[in-house]
Amino acid sequence: MYDINKVRADFPILSRTVYDRPLVYLDNGATTQKPLCVLDAMREEYLNANANVHRGVHYLSQRATDLHEAARETVRQFINAPKTEEIIFTRGTTESINLVAASFCEAFMAEGDEVIVSVMEHHSNIVPWQLQAAKRGIALKVIPMDDSGKLDMQVYEQLFSEKTKIVSVAHVSNTLGTVNPVKEIVRIAHEHGVPVLVDGAQSTPHFAVDVQSIDCDFFAFSGHKIYGPTGIGVLYGKEEWLDRMPPYQGGGEMIESVSFEKTTFEKLPFKFEAGTPDYVATHGLATALNYVSALGMDNIAAHERELTDYCMARLAEIDGMRLFGTTEGKDAVVSFLVGDIHHLDMGTLLDRLGIAVRTGHHCAQPVMDRFGIQGTVRASFGLYNTKEEVDALVAGVKRVSQMF
């Protein structure tokens, strides 16, 4: 286990106050804070190695290119992908899923074909498929879940038909914290000859991910949720699929040759990386991945699950408490309501106590519909959170509850 005080010292923002109270930051599911090493690495590149990548023979361009491609290799190692060519840089998980939805559907799907998703998906893993459904006449099938937030795997198996072309599911629910059995989901899909995209936005920051062990065909995650910069994300895809998928966008760098008669495209991964990439952000992402790797993903997972269990137990002591997402082994997310108190009121008053949580539907309205509610209060943990901060949350919830 790591020294939590030393870790917190790496994040300057955690020492600030809000409304003259110590900041208790429990909104890591939305975005994480950044360690000094990430901020310093990005500043250093802008100061001393800022130039466009893949486009210049001069020193600065070569240096920036080396850092950018080294970041790709860092990502490959972090998720244990077989090849660097299978690592595509995007703007985030949302763009990664949109890329797959648009390109895969163009290559492999026709009117009447089907996509399987789950009821607990983030809107970013629903809307891209709906856009394709409206354009191409394909259909979405939905895996239901029980009252604890666990997917119904029996129904999942029954959803497959000869029209099923892809499955796209969250590794971890951003609202419930449910850790889905993605290896089993992939195994079943592959028995039907169907590829699987895994949304790893809420898993990659919290425990070790091995895409070869999962055997998923696509995997997406975001930099800003794993202590890296905003605006950078990753799509891993098996070469056998990516090679057969058309480019998602057109522009510079993704071409091999251009004439007014015909354009030919670059090989992987550049075929899917049109335009100037955010090469400073890729360096920042790599620095963040090295930071969490040094702490140990198993250590981070153990720390955060201890916090999650502790928070669930403490909140359950409060009269009128309703906890959403109660599956065993859930990860780093606690969603709740208290009595008839509106989630926005609870979140607003907690904020006045210096406690940052998220309120609302968390970009997962079908989850709210499943439980017959409009929204929840969500506390989500990161590697720097403490039991004392959980205690502050519990005390804050009790104090707010007494106002109603």
Where on the chain are the PLM-derived regions?
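Pyridoxal 5′-phosphate
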Residues: 1-404
